Amino acid sequence: MSVPKGERNKSKREFDDLFFTVYRDAIDTISHQFYASDTKKVTYKFLIDDKSREILFICDAILRNIRVANSIYPQALSEYYDRRNQQNHAIGLCYALLTNYQIVANVIELPERRLITNIENATHLINAIRAWRKSDNHFKNELKAKAKDDAKKSDSAEAQKVEKASSEKGKDTTDKK
């Protein structure tokens, strides 16, 4: 049975769409050379070129971290922490992206309105990844409970072995007398 489109929950992969919005914004901004005036384009050509490459590199790294984190379905706590580290790296790279936009805006003296969409979308992406990371806490709780149950089973199996060994030892000493 299908759910009517209006009643569907928003996809948990919202950050994927957000990322491509951020990426398109970055490419658009770079293709317009950060909306700098002609004199500033000449004066700050080195900065524009350098920050353009850096912003594209950061966007590629964000995508890579999101994809790697999404490919890990944790079956153990170590996998949960690996997934979380990838999410944390993606968030850190989003902040690096924001920092690069701020550097360009301050040095080239751009009006705030020029990069506001880029900054809002990057901030929205950060919040989406944080929400994704928060929703993953159920994995941690389940994996801790599983580890606790496994430890109890292991302890009870070990106790049974010790008990069996001691009872066999007791039989051996009574047989010798």
Region spans (language model):
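Amphipathic alpha-helical assembly/interaction segments
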Residues: 1-177
